[in-house]
Design a protein with these regions (language model features):
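A short, N-terminal "cap"/entry segment at the start of jelly-roll beta-barrel domains
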Residues: 1-54, 135-155
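Conserved hydrophobic/aromatic beta-strand scaffold that supports enzyme active sites
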Residues: 44-46, 57-59, 78, 98-100, ...
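Short acidic-glycine-tyrosine-enriched beta hairpin
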Residues: 87-111
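Ligand-binding loop in jelly-roll beta-barrel domains
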Residues: 103-130
Length: 155
């Protein structure tokens, strides 16, 4: 019935580009399980990922008292807070608020009360380690074959 309505509406507008069937991917995040990441206190639901480009859109759930270690953004990062709040040296972002990070910006992020955020990455973050070296890393799910440690990534 819905397909008939779409086809009928298209026929009424000559010159209109026809939609690509199967060109959209619909998800029900509420039915997806939270997966652990390599960062204690942070779990993830991946909504979209292009591993070749390094792009990712995901929900991240921060437990109260969580800190994401110092890292740099090689591309802009966009974040919308759905629940709770998180903060860094530049300010605090609360439920219903949005923040984006400039290319090359570095920060450590904290959440005292916990948070659920929608994050959009164009490239994986680069994490700085106390030993003074830098490795590219991205948020990954822990699996039996990948215990979730931060390691070099291609790209």
């Amino acid at each position: 019935m819905r397909q008939e309505a779409i086809t009928t509406a298209s026929a009424k507008r000559p010159g209109r580009v026809e939609p690509t069937m199967g060109g959209s991917t619909y998800l029900k995040p509420q039915d997806m399980a939270w997966e652990p990441t390599q960062f204690d206190g942070i779990s993830i639901k991946v909504l979209y990922e292009d591993k070749e480009k390094g792009e990712m859109t995901c929900f991240l759930k921060w437990e109260p008292g969580t800190t994401l270690p110092m890292h740099t953004h090689p591309e802009i990062e966009q974040t919308f807070v759905l629940e709770g709040s998180f903060y860094d040296h530049d300010g605090i972002c609360r439920a219903g608020e949005f923040v984006w990070r400039r290319v090359g910006s570095s920060h450590e992020t904290h959440s005292d009360e916990g948070a659920v955020i929608l994050a959009i990455y164009r490239k994986p973050n680069v994490f700085q380690h106390s030993a003074g070296y830098v490795r590219k890393a991205k948020i990954v799910k822990k699996t039996a074959s990948s215990p979730g440690t931060i390691g070099p990534q291609s790209g």
